């Protein structure tokens, strides 16, 4: 029940060999605490991002870089903010409801993509006698 350490000087990597379940649990708990915390944006930063989103919901890399520098936010967070904001807008536009694969349409038919149920199945339902002659 010990931790053996091995240091490879060439690769400059530190490797731990864990021998017991207790040590594995301890190691996993340590990993959770090292998780990066969420970046909190100020109201002013959000206002700037929102105003830019109204102008262009898909900004180019130069615009994102300028926003990153001006707002002191990492570029990756700018990209993620725009991605999340586009998803939020799409959800609001769709009415906030999830769409299923099949949407019921008039006449009791079901639409799947662009092909209606009748187009997929050439038989009449319920089956008529002519099919069983």
Swiss-Prot record:
Keywords assigned: DNA-binding, Homeobox, Nucleus
SUPFAM superfamilies: Homeodomain-like (SSF46689)
Assigned GO CC terms: nucleus
The organism's place on the tree of life at top rank: Eukaryota
CDD domains found in the cross-reference section: homeodomain
Segments of this protein annotated with the region Disordered: 86-109
Gene3D superfamilies associated with the record: Homeodomain-like
InterPro entries: HD, Homeobox_CS, Homeobox_domain, Homeodomain-like_sf
One function term, GO molecular function aspect: transcription cis-regulatory region binding
Coiled coil: none
Pfam short name (any one): Homeodomain
UniProt DNA-binding residue ranges: 34-93
Localization (cell): Nucleus
Name under which the protein is recorded: Homeobox protein HD-5
Organism annotation: Encephalitozoon cuniculi (strain GB-M1) (Microsporidian parasite)
């Amino acid at each position: 029940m010990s931790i053996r350490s091995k240091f490879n000087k060439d690769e400059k990597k530190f490797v731990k060999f864990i021998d017991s379940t207790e040590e594995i649990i301890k190691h996993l708990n340590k990993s959770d605490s090292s998780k990066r915390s969420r970046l909190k944006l100020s109201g002013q930063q959000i206002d700037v991002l929102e105003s830019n989103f109204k102008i262009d919901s898909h900004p180019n890399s130069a615009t994102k870089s300028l926003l990153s520098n001006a707002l002191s936010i990492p570029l990756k967070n700018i990209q993620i903010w725009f991605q999340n904001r586009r998803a939020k807008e799409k959800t609001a536009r769709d009415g906030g409801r999830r769409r299923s694969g099949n949407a019921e349409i008039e006449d009791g038919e079901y639409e799947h993509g662009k092909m209606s149920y009748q187009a997929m199945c050439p038989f009449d339902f319920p089956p008529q006698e002519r099919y069983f002659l």
